[in-house]
């Protein structure tokens, strides 16, 4: 059995309090002002719809204006670019999210280039990722899911992650790739794995933690982990029985994030923290 369940809600609550404080301050100074977040869908991906519904619920609780633009799975690349460019140019829109993955045939890398970096609350535009890769995180909007993973690792391993060894399974655009740089920026030795990695048990054995973010239910199994491991499950898979992660539940490890309830709540809170930061960047205000 898992020795510790690592829940994201306590950390998410702390972040949300800061977001509420910023929104309250704006409401007092500018009655009627609401930051506006727009989520753009161009696929039939069920996991993306789960994320959108979660964002909408959180926006309603916070008092943030939220709009979902569903272009459908048959959207054309030029149409997607035009929508993202229009949202980026709209002064009434403060944050833009492109829900990934896109429908087959659509180029996510090309589409992300059409989101203004200062409205990129998911931190996935080339400009923000370049700052992260260069170790200039203070100037960027950081991707919320990798940032959630780093927060949760610190909860168990301590604030100083220097010298720790972490395996990241899944070199994806939204989690694995940016997380690799973000952990490296904190002095972590990162081993990047994928679904084709051979002898995964041996690769994982010396690691302090394992982060899995592939989108493959049951990918990480009991025979592949060690009792000293901290497992952060950033996978999301929609099954007939509900939403599950990439790791088998209740692994025999030191600590494990459940799905749902682990990475997800903190990711949502950090995205809205990014929205606050984005508003300040767009207004030319000082950003901490």
UniProtKB/Swiss-Prot annotation:
Which reactions fall under this protein's catalytic activity? (6R)-5,10-methylene-5,6,7,8-tetrahydrofolate + NADP(+) = (6R)-5,10-methenyltetrahydrofolate + NADPH; (6R)-5,10-methenyltetrahydrofolate + H2O = (6R)-10-formyltetrahydrofolate + H(+)
Which SUPFAM superfamilies does the record match to this protein?
Answer: Aminoacid dehydrogenase-like, N-terminal domain, NAD(P)-binding Rossmann-fold domains
The enzyme's E.C. designation: 1.5.1.5, 3.5.4.9
What's a single GO CC term here?
cytosol
Origin superkingdom: Bacteria
- Which Gene3D superfamilies does this UniProt record tie to the protein? Leucine Dehydrogenase, chain A, domain 1, NAD(P)-binding Rossmann-like Domain
Binding partners and assembly: Homodimer.
**Member of which family?**
Belongs to the tetrahydrofolate dehydrogenase/cyclohydrolase family.
Q: What is this protein called?
A: Bifunctional protein FolD 1
| Gene name tied to this protein | folD1
């Amino acid at each position: 059995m898992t020795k510790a369940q690592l829940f994201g809600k306590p950390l998410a609550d702390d972040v949300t309090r800061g977001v509420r404080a910023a929104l309250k301050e704006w409401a007092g100074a500018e009655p009627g002002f609401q930051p506006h977040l727009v989520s753009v869908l161009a696929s039939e991906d069920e996991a993306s719809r789960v994320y959108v519904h979660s964002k909408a619920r959180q926006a309603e609780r916070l008092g943030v204006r939220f709009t979902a633009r569903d272009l459908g799975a048959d959207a054309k690349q030029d149409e997607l670019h035009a929508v993202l460019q229009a949202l980026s140019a709209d002064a009434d829109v403060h944050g833009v999210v492109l829900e990934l993955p896109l429908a087959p045939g659509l180029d996510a890398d090309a589409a992300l280039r059409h989101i203004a970096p200062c409205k990129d609350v998911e931190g996935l535009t080339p400009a923000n990722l370049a700052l992260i890769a260069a170790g200039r995180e203070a100037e960027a909007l950081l991707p919320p899911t990798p940032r959630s993973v780093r927060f949760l690792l610190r909860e168990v391993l301590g604030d100083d992650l220097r010298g720790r060894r972490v395996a990241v399974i899944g070199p994806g655009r939204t989690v694995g790739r940016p997380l690799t740089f973000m952990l490296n920026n904190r002095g972590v030795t990162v081993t990047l794995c994928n679904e084709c990695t051979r002898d995964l048990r041996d690769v994982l054995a010396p690691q302090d933690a394992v982060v899995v973010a592939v989108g493959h239910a049951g990918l990480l199994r009991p025979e592949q982990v060690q009792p000293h491991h901290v497992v952060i499950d950033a996978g999301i898979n929609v099954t007939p029985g509900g939403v599950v992660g990439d790791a088998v539940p209740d692994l025999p490890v030191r600590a494990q994030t459940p799905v749902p309830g682990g990475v997800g709540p903190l990711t949502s809170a950090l995205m809205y923290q990014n929205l606050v930061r984005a508003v300040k960047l767009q207004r030319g205000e000082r950003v901490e």
